[in-house]
């Protein structure tokens, strides 16, 4: 009960918990019965084996049974408006992951020119952090090659001018997870049909892609609720991005959130990340 597991993961988490617990008990029993440490009596041997097996089983539980702790990522724009050194000095290694936002003029005509070299800077500052990228473009195919070099997940929008399956396949061919973006301002009839072949889904909760500091789109709550009621909900991770703060994240059921202005404009960005993590997992 010290681990906060979303309701739709109860069955899977319980299965992992029982499997790991039974396996660890079986291993412990046979090791204790047939193995004795030299110069140690039976009771001490059992105590040592029990401790070792417990630590191994506990780590497996963390990795599998209770792996669904909600995560907070910070958004970094792939342009020249932000300085990576400044961002790092504010948040250091406190974010759970790094979310890279990229938008071109097909989705926002007022956007500045991209700076793809920032990927190298990001990777240098956070070498062990997971990088998830969000391509906001109606023609994402031309960007997949460069994004695949640095990303573990590449999100793209459903409202594009290219074939969705082709984009998805190109991302997968680069051994990267494709993620589908749904915009909260749109209404989707068959959500399950749209997301059923994805392990990662992102809901964009602001009106204009690529602009930080916008208000949370209230209709987003309805879309999030519809997605969380899907019968296949445990098959994908849900990420919520845009306009998030302490006031609304407590009402959001998801695995990950993305924050930019709420963290960076705070007087203590590191503490704010911790606050968001606590609220999400409370």
Language model regions located:
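Alpha-helix-loop-beta-strand connector modules within alpha/beta enzyme cores
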Residues: 112-133, 170, 174-179, 183, ...
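N-terminal active-site wall of soluble small-molecule enzyme domains
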Residues: 99-170
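Glycine-rich phosphate-binding active-site loops on the catalytic face of alpha/beta enzymes
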Residues: 158-162, 202-213, 254-273
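Interaction-mediating elements
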Residues: 1-68
């Amino acid at each position: 009960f010290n681990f906060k597991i979303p309701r739709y993961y109860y069955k899977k988490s319980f299965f992992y918990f029982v499997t790991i617990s039974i396996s660890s008990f079986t291993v412990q029993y046979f090791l204790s019965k047939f193995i004795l440490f030299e110069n140690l009596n039976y009771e001490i041997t059992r105590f040592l084996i029990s401790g070792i097996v417990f630590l191994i089983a506990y780590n497996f539980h963390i990795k599998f049974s209770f792996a669904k702790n909600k995560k907070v990522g910070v958004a970094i724009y792939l342009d020249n408006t932000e300085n990576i050194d400044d961002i790092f000095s504010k948040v250091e290694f406190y974010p759970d992951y790094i979310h890279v936002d990229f938008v071109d003029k097909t989705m926002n005509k007022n956007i500045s020119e991209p700076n793809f070299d920032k990927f190298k800077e990001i990777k240098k500052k956070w070498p062990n952090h997971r990088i998830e990228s969000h391509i906001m473009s109606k023609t994402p195919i031309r960007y997949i090659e460069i994004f695949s070099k640095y990303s573990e997940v590449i999100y793209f929008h459903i409202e594009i001018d290219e074939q969705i399956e082709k984009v998805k396949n190109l991302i997968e061919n680069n051994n990267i997870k494709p993620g589908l973006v749904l915009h909260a301002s749109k209404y989707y009839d068959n959500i399950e049909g749209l997301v059923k072949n994805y392990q990662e889904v992102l809901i964009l909760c602001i009106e204009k892609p690529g602009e930080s500091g916008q208000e949370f789109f209230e209709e987003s709550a309805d879309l999030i609720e519809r997605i969380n009621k899907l019968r296949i909900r445990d098959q994908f991770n849900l990420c919520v991005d845009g306009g998030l703060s302490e006031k609304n994240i407590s009402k959001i059921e998801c695995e990950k959130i993305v924050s930019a202005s709420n963290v960076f404009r705070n007087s203590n960005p590191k503490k704010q990340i911790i606050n968001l993590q606590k609220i999400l997992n409370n």
